From Swiss-Prot:
InterPro entries xref list: MbnB/TglH/ChrH, Xyl_isomerase-like_sf
Taxonomic classification: Bacteria, Pseudomonadati, Pseudomonadota, Gammaproteobacteria, Pasteurellales
One Pfam family recorded for the sequence: MbnB_TglH_ChrH
Protein name per its UniProtKB record: UPF0276 protein CGSHiEE_05645
Domain of life: Bacteria
Species this protein is from: Haemophilus influenzae (strain PittEE)
Length: 307
């Protein structure tokens, strides 16, 4: 089975809905985190096994801590490789972050955007690729504190690591938008103009939460939105939070469409939803919208992986 088209993250809350889907539906693949599923058993594992027989599987890590200082978690890597082998998955991605410092921090934290960090993360990625026996992809993360010691911007940092490690780039479109709004350092459209498009081989899209009453003002003002004039910003809520608990916002859909216009191939694209689940029909409609955008730009080559 090939990993291509539009997908939806597999969650235990959605298991019955996945299993009731008819053949040839809009959802073309699923994704799980090895930390959550490597040792899962019981009815949850039985249902997942059934879903994995129907859908190609992408594996997306949460806690390898590629930016951390502690040695890579070899047990986690072994579990990840075993999970991928069991379900014939050939795609793995991880976050550009760290989540340990003398203990597990239960969050994805940023590092300074420096040349030293580039070399550190790239070496750890090469180690992971050697262990798994495949090229992995690196995801841009949302972050809420910017280091004053950074010597490059976020997309320059991502590109430099991907080139140094010879890995793929996993674009999270919502994270690009959230960071652009929260920090005001890099217009999301400029990010997409500057990212190494030849390395982009996977995309996430998700919803975010707006932490300010000004959100209503934004919704009602057509001339206060991001536009294609690079560097133009709108009046915005004080803080956007990458929650994966809301429907995808229109501004993020616009950014995904712009990404498809920029990319030489249309990568597999997954909708993330982690809590606050709506009726499954609403999630399915969002996946259908991804598929429609992919079809709109189908003049470019469609990217796929054997999975």
């Amino acid at each position: 089975m090939k990993l291509q088209g539009a997908g939806l993250g597999y969650r235990r809350n959605l298991a019955e809905d996945f299993l009731q889907l008819p053949p040839n539906n809009a959802i073309q693949f699923i994704e799980v985190a090895p930390e959550n599923w490597s040792k899962m058993g019981g009815m949850a594992r039985y249902q997942f096994d059934q879903a994995a027989e129907r859908f190609p599987l992408a594996v997306h890590g949460l806690s390898l801590s590629l930016g951390g200082q502690a040695p890579l978690d070899r047990k986690l890597l072994r579990n990840t490789k075993a999970l991928m082998n069991q379900y014939n998955s050939s795609f793995f991605s991880e976050h550009l972050s760290y989540c340990e410092c003398e203990g597990h921090l239960y969050d994805l934290l940023p590092m300074p955007f420096t040349e030293e960090a580039v070399k550190h993360v790239a070496q750890r990625i090469r180690d992971v690729q050697d262990f798994l026996g495949l090229q992995i992809s690196l995801e841009n993360t949302s972050y809420y504190l910017h280091s004053p010691t950074s010597t490059m911007n976020e997309v320059e940092f991502l590109n430099a690591i991907a080139q140094e490690a010879n890995c793929g780039i996993h674009l999270d479109v919502n994270n690009i938008y959230v960071n652009g709004v929260n920090h005001g350092l890099l217009d999301p459209y400029v990010f997409l103009d500057q990212v190494d498009v030849k390395r982009v081989n996977y995309i996430h899209i998700a919803g975010h939460d707006e932490e300010h009453s000004a959100a209503q003002v934004v919704e009602n003002s057509a001339d206060e939105s991001f536009n294609k004039v690079k560097g133009a910003y709108r009046h915005l809520p004080e803080l956007l939070i990458d929650t994966h608990g809301e429907a995808v916002k229109g501004t993020v859909w616009d950014l995904l469409e712009y990404a498809y216009q920029r990319l030489p191939t249309i990568p597999p694209t997954l909708l993330e939803r982690d809590f606050n689940f709506p009726p499954f029909a609403e999630l399915y409609a969002e996946v259908e919208h991804i598929a429609q955008l992919q079809q709109k730009y189908a003049h470019t080559e469609v990217m796929s992986y054997a999975a």
